[in-house]
């Protein structure tokens, strides 16, 4: 029996990630002078890098935490797609399920970070380069077929949807087959996820919860409103666990047994440096914790601790196992919210 402050051994777990592979592109700069062309600052370029983002970031987190990791998705035959694959392969992640496709651009999020010398880089601007069309149906079907073939051979599946069209009914059908074969299946959603009814867990942020329940974020700011929306999803879409991530507000876990919610405040005592990739880190850690047999509240605490590690770093940084082991003993403990209400349906 593991004590609450011990991270389980994830090395025996085989985990697949399916979803939208993204390139996170960082441009680093130092302030120079005011421009004579416009009332803006001229920045002096001092470096850049491309990191795996989206589902690729989730895969890197799983691997860094010790799991045997497979990734399924698509990339374009462009520099960003090749670079994302190169870095995944460098980490000994199985990318045989990734399809390079024509008539596509690998989604790329360019973040410009700047600061004075000796200070922490802060994000100044983000520019997104996205494909003009969604992933084609025949490509989705091919990926889903590969995914379904993993049923019975993996311990967990993490579905990372960033809205580029890969995650659809075909992937949902394959996910149900994998879950029926005994694996934990976790969805990090974007928009409607009714096709994933009965899945092990869904991890929306506040905006995604609002999209799924047709509510504005402003209407979800009280715990009562949040719990009402969560109960609606538990009834309608029926995930076993609903973990709502609230940024610096922490996380709230809802289940049919705990419809009022179990909360945990955000981990980390320092000022947040960069939230890029924190969602993927939390999803990866939560998936592994469930696959290792932890109950929902303990899995949430571990995911919160992992997210608290990466927000202290600039860029899309995965959470190393050693850092998680150091952070977990100091991570906040979950607490129940005494606002019970029955879940029906």
Regions found by a protein language model. Give the residues of each.
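Extended, hydrophobic alpha-helical segments in both membrane/secreted and soluble proteins
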Residues: 158, 174, 183-195, 199, ...
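Flexible glycine/proline-rich, aromatic-decorated loop/lid segments
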Residues: 33-38, 199-207, 212, 250-279, ...
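A short, aliphatic-rich alpha-helical micro-motif
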Residues: 10, 151-152, 196-197
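Conserved N-terminal subdomain of the carbohydrate kinase-like
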Residues: 6, 15, 23-156, 318-345
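Structural motif
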Residues: 16-18, 126, 155-158, 186, ...
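Conserved post-catalytic alpha-helical subdomain immediately downstream of the catalytic base
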Residues: 237-240, 244, 267-331
């Amino acid at each position: 029996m593991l004590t609450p402050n011990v991270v389980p051994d994830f090395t025996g777990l085989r985990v697949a990630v399916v979803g939208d592979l993204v390139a996170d592109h960082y441009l680093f700069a130092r302030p120079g002078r005011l421009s004579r062309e416009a009332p803006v600052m001229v920045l002096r370029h001092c470096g850049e890098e491309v990191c795996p983002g989206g589902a690729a970031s989730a895969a890197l987190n799983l691997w860094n935490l010790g799991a045997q990791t497979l990734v399924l998705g698509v990339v374009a035959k462009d520099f960003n797609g090749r670079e994302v694959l190169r870095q995944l392969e460098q980490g000994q992640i199985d990318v045989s399920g990734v399809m390079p496709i024509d008539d596509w651009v690998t989604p790329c999020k360019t973040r410009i970070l700047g600061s004075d010398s000796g200070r922490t880089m802060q994000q100044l601007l983000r520019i997104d380069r996205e494909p003009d069309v969604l992933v084609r149906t025949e490509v989705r079907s091919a990926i889903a077929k590969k995914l379904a073939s993993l049923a019975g051979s993996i311990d967990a599946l993490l579905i990372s949807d960033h809205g580029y069209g890969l995650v659809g009914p075909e992937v949902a059908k394959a996910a149900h087959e994998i879950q029926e074969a005994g694996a934990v299946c976790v969805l990090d959603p974007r928009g409607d996820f009714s096709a994933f009814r009965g899945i092990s867990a869904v991890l929306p942020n506040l905006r995604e919860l609002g999209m799924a329940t047709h509510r504005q974020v402003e209407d979800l700011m009280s715990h009562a409103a949040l719990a009402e929306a969560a109960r609606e999803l538990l009834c309608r879409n029926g995930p076993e666990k609903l973990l709502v991530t609230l940024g610096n507000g922490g996380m709230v876990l809802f289940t049919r047994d705990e419809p009022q919610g179990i909360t945990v405040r955000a981990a980390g005592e320092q000022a947040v440096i960069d939230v890029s990739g924190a969602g993927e880190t939390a999803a990866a850690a939560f998936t592994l914790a469930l696959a290792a047999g932890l109950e929902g509240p303990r899995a949430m605490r571990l995911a919160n601790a992992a997210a608290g590690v990466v927000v202290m770093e600039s860029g899309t940084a995965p959470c190393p196992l050693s850092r998680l082991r150091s952070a977990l003993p100091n991570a906040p403990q979950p607490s129940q919210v005494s606002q019970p209400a029955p879940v029906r349906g």
